[in-house]
């Protein structure tokens, strides 16, 4: 059963769980930050995503992501980075007091630290947003109920030269596939927002503050033979 994460009690629970990590992480330098916007779309709890512009340069163009970007020297901390980038990309101004806390940092292939910032942005119609077309092609929301359905969850094994490198979650059957670091951050958010409902299968992918809430399921088998494992996708 999906808990009422949009209630005042749900928000307070999440804030308390994230308080320790938030105090530590806000004081640390990072390369980038993203906002994880928890919203209500026609009364349904959802996470807000962007589809990066296909006109951008770099390997991540056209990927699903959360709004965010590199830290600027003028930013006070990672929270201000996430809020500034969200305003620039989506035209969405999120007050700092709507930030619930910081999730566990993730690291891109260049070992840069990316800090996810969870915020409650309230009722929202994604179609009413006017994103910056130079950075964003599309804005869409995925209900938490959709993300929590096992048929919409999978795992991608990344192999190179026949050798296993790593495995990451992937969320399927929405407007666009959610994968890579965005899927990892989504997994962290689900552990926090739906304790006992979402059970990650990857040891080590546990959100700060949710260590006692989610226990990884049985580890995945056959890392470089994902095609023989039901529900998995093989990444290259």
From Swiss-Prot:
Cofactor: Mg(2+); Mn(2+)
Signal peptide start-end: none
Sites of N6-succinyllysine modification: 70
Protein name: Mitochondrial coenzyme A diphosphatase NUDT8
Similarity comment text for this entry: Belongs to the Nudix hydrolase family.
Protein role: Acyl-CoA diphosphatase that mediates the hydrolysis of a wide range of CoA and CoA esters yielding 3',5'-ADP and the corresponding 4'-phosphopantetheine derivative as products. Hydrolyzes short- and medium-chain acyl-CoAs, exhibiting the highest activity toward free CoA, hexanoyl-CoA, and octanoyl-CoA and the lowest activity against acetyl-CoA. Exhibits decapping activity towards dpCoA-capped RNAs in vitro.
Catalyzed chemical reaction(s): an acyl-CoA + H2O = an acyl-4'-phosphopantetheine + adenosine 3',5'-bisphosphate + 2 H(+); CoA + H2O = (R)-4'-phosphopantetheine + adenosine 3',5'-bisphosphate + 2 H(+); acetyl-CoA + H2O = S-acetyl-4'-phosphopantetheine + adenosine 3',5'-bisphosphate + 2 H(+); butanoyl-CoA + H2O = S-butanoyl-4'-phosphopantetheine + adenosine 3',5'-bisphosphate + 2 H(+)
Residue ranges crossing the lipid bilayer per the database entry: none
Binding site for Mg(2+): 85, 89
Motif Nudix box per record, residues: 70-91
Record's keyword terms, sorted: Hydrolase, Magnesium, Manganese, Metal-binding, Mitochondrion
GO terms, molecular function: coenzyme A diphosphatase activity; magnesium ion binding; manganese ion binding
Nudix hydrolase domain: residues covered: 25-172
GO biological processes: acetyl-CoA catabolic process; butyryl-CoA catabolic process; coenzyme A catabolic process; malonyl-CoA catabolic process; medium-chain fatty-acyl-CoA catabolic process; propionyl-CoA catabolic process; succinyl-CoA catabolic process
Entry EC number(s): 3.6.1.-, 3.6.1.77
Cell compartments where the protein resides: Mitochondrion
The protein's assembly and partners: Monomer.
GO cellular component terms attached to this protein's record: mitochondrion
């Amino acid at each position: 059963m999906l808990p009422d994460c949009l209630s005042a009690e749900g928000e307070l629970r999440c804030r308390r769980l994230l308080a320790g990590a938030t105090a530590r992480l806000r004081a640390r330098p990072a390369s980038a930050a993203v906002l994880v916007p928890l919203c209500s779309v026609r009364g349904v709890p959802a996470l807000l995503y962007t589809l990066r512009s296909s006109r951008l340069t770099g390997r991540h163009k056209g990927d699903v992501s959360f709004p965010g970007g590199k830290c600027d020297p003028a930013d006070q901390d990672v929270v201000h980075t996430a809020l500034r980038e969200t305003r620039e990309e989506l035209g969405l101004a999120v007050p700092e007091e709507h930030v619930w806390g910081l999730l566990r940092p993730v690291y891109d292939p260049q070992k840069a630290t990316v800090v996810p910032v969870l915020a409650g942005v309230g009722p929202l119609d994604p179609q009413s947003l006017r994103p910056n077309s130079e950075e964003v092609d599309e804005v869409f929301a995925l209900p938490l109920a959709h993300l929590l359905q096992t048929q919409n969850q999978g795992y991608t094994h990344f192999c190179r030269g026949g050798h296993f490198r790593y495995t990451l979650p992937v969320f399927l059957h929405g407007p666009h596939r959610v994968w890579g670091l965005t899927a990892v951050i989504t997994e962290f958010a689900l552990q926090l927002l739906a304790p006992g409902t979402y059970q990650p299968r990857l040891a080590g992918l546990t959100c700060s503050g949710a260590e006692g809430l989610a226990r990884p399921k049985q580890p995945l088998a056959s890392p470089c033979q994902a095609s023989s494992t039901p529900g998995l996708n093989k990444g290259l």
